[in-house]
């Protein structure tokens, strides 16, 4: 069965989606988040909140995401944190990512929505495919699926023996998910994770072409494996000289940014934006801490080094997140503009037909 959109969806914070301008070629979410050609964009990682402790309040969260969309940020990324593990100190964005993505798909209308990342080996590929295709359809083609094996080993035993070695499980999970969200969705698939009979397909079928699957980190794989199987690579914050070597190797395997068939490279980290715009950089594990002027210079260095998107997490700021977002929007976003790729018309109702 295949679900087809029929009519524009209900409005979001900036109004409903408009007529589809996607056409053939890359998925519309990829074109907006990663325009390529040496141009980087700015993305945000949930939660959009400055806080101390393990779990955010999530007060005013939808309004803040809407404000980020209005300002022109390219994408908003959610994390997959099912359990609060003692000593880990991180409850993610509190809400289940798929439930939250459903809310965001209707509350927003342009910003790309992604996971960074779904811990694929802890979820069955059929369920991940169903959820991602649903969000993509509801949002008008704005879904990017970042995948990882996870960095929280304390969670793994809660999922039973089948999840005991997430890195070993990744290739089978990835292949099954790719089959379900790709082009040949009715040919059948045989996997240690399940048997999909010929003629059995996902519903809704991906409505805007093959869903992009992005790798976070390496997942216990080689960079060659990532380059072959993923549609893009999300990596943690690196010093510019290390990042440049990383992206150079990636480009040798996948092609230059913006060229036909090339694959994007994004870099994610915590950002503490000082009130003094000239405040010098200081060390911050997995991130950056400084004023906006050296930050702009640093991000331009990353852009020149081949980074297609810089993804920032604001949770460690002592200043309110609204204030930090406003400063980024005024002083950094003009240097990293998001292309005007309109989403497809969202479904107000669905027409279902047989294969």
Predicted regions and their residues:
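An alpha-helical appendage that flanks or caps ligand/catalytic pockets
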Residues: 13-38, 164-207, 236-355
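Short, acidic/polar
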Residues: 55-68, 131, 215-225, 290-302
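Acidic (Asp/Glu)-rich catalytic clusters
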Residues: 32-37, 69-70, 101-110, 132, ...
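Flexible, glycine-rich active-site loops centered on histidine and acidic residues
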Residues: 39-56, 120-189, 237, 241
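Active-site mouth loops of central-metabolism enzymes
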Residues: 46-59, 118-126, 208-218, 280-293
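N-terminal beta1-alpha1-beta2 module of alpha/beta enzyme domains
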Residues: 1-107, 211, 315-319, 327, ...
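Conserved, mostly hydrophobic/aromatic
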Residues: 72, 80, 104, 135, ...
